[in-house]
Structures are given as C-alpha cells and as structure tokens.
Amino acid sequence: MKKIMITGALGQIGTELVVKCREIYGTDNVLATDIREPEADSPVQNGPFEILDVTDRDRMFELVRDFEADSLMHMAALLSATAEKNPILAWDLNMGGLMNALEAARTYNLHFFTPSSIGAFGDSTPKVNTPQVTIQQPTTMYGVNKVAGELLCQYYFKRFGVDTRSVRFPGLISHVKEPGGGTTDYAVEIYFKAVREGHYTSFIDKGTYMDMMYMDDAIEAIIKLMEADDAKLETRNGYNLSAMSFDPEMVKEAIQEYYPNFTLDYDVDPIRQGIANSWPDSIDTSCSRGEWGFDPKYDLASMTKLMLEAIEQKDTVKNNN
C-alpha cells in the first residue's frame, strides 16, 4: 500500500485507522473521507480530507482517480443498534456504499478492505468457539448487511479478481472516540462513567458474554492483513477475529482494581440485548492466526488499565484548558 483512501474516516474505527496509516505511510498518502467535516480537535484534521457520501458513486470514483489511490479501506456504515432502528437507511447506506466501493476497487484495480462483524452470526450459529465457516443466519438488518457484504467481497474476488480482504470484528474498545449506535458500546461507556461518575447503568445484562478487542489490536490487524502475502490468504469473505470474551460483571471487577468504589447496575435495552443474545459467546480465530499472523496484545486486565489512564489524562487536559 502506498496511497490509501479511507471512507467513514470520522467513525470509531476510521479515526484511529487514519492516524495509524498516516504514521506508517505518510500523512499526504492517506486520504480521509466522510459525509461531514471533522471537528476542530479531530486527529483526522492533520492531512488530506474530502467530503464523501458513499452512496454517490461518481464522487467516490472521482476521489479515487484524483488521489491516485492504490488501496481503498471502506469503513463507512450504520452500526447494529442504529441500523435496527432505521433498516431501510441501513440497507441503502451499508449495501449501496459497499457496492460503490467494490466497483471502485474493480475499476481502478485497488487493494480493498472492508470490515465484517460478529453481527454476521445469528441464533443458529454455534455459540462457543464459533468456527470460521459456519451457519450465518443473523436476526438483524446490520447482520444481514454484513453477510451480504461478505458474499459480495468473495464474489468480487472470484468473479473479477479484486483483492478483497475483511475481518469479522468483535466489539471494539477505545478511549479516542466515544461510541454511538453499537450493541457492544457498553464496554466503552463503562470506562468513561467509571472515571467521571463512579457508577454505570448497563443496557446489556449480566451473564451476556461477547467477543471484544482493544482498538490498537484492531488497527494492527487491519494493516497486518492488508500487508499479508496474497498467496497465503484462503478466506475472502471475512476472518474471525477476537482478543477476549467477557460480560459486564467481569469489566466491573477489572475496574474495581483501580476504582474500588465503582458500582454497576442494569437497565436492559431489549433491542440491544436481543441483538447480543443472537451473537456468539466466543469465536475461533485459528485461521487469522495461521494465515496472516494475527496476534492480539491486550487482554481485559491490560486494556482496563490503559483505558482508565487514558480517560483520566484526557479529562485532566480538558479541565486545565
């Protein structure tokens, strides 16, 4: 990869992906795009940025041509809970945007990445150590989008030879950008509330285990997969990916190592709880590890320490300004 265009660059993943890619490949070699302008304090501000509605194919093609991109990372999407509230919009944005991005990759011979998700699984999927190849019958519009997206990526690889690469992300946890619209968002919100209020009310019930990953590991995985030897990759629809599996009570106990008085209670959101119940408790990542060397560095304990320290530092800086 030498010239990279990233859609959805102001999202939770996109923001940190832009920063890391600019560190590695050079600021001027990474074009960030999103449907709105970045805020004044956004780290995306320090390099090339263009407005892009991913449902506008002509505009997407124009940006790819003008930037002379050789790689496209398509991150723009509505997340699970938001998509469930707006299923028509979710289909139009998630699928229309992906089709435009894949067509751009086909037309301009781009290396292509787009994320899938554990949301691609459903009630009939094996819940524990979910295999790489298994039943995928999701019960949400977001999940339907992700399964369709996986199949499209596989189709474009087999039919047109497009170098498509993807991973099924678990819940992603980061202190850089507060979340919005995801079922796993509780696992981010809980850290901010622990530092700022000493209490959190979880919309996901105790005993609900979901796969998670610290954002640094997720960004590293994207770059590692994109740089991997093409000949070693046997999966083109989406690699299973995870670093840990936990429920809200386990996060509470990890936080209490640093904030002993932290408390947790529950006000379960039936929509997001229903989504969570349809997802695996844990997934098998052996294909990712074997084919391109996926090796996450962070577990719950080390992630908790970093999250709390980063939020404390962020709030200290904000209060001193």
UniProtKB/Swiss-Prot annotation:
Gene Ontology MF term list: L-threonine 3-dehydrogenase activity
The similarity comment for this entry is: Belongs to the NAD(P)-dependent epimerase/dehydratase family.
Which sequence ranges form a coiled-coil region, renumbered to this chain? none
Q: Which SUPFAM superfamilies match?
A: NAD(P)-binding Rossmann-fold domains (SSF51735)
What protein am I looking at? Uncharacterized epimerase/dehydratase SAOUHSC_00535
Output the superkingdom of the source species.
Answer: Bacteria
User: What's a single GO BP term from this record?
Assistant: threonine catabolic process
Q: What is the lineage of its organism?
A: Bacteria, Bacillati, Bacillota, Bacilli, Bacillales
Q: Where are the transmembrane segments?
A: none
Which Pfam families does the record cross-reference, listed alphabetically? Epimerase
- Origin species, per record, is Staphylococcus aureus (strain NCTC 8325 / PS 47)
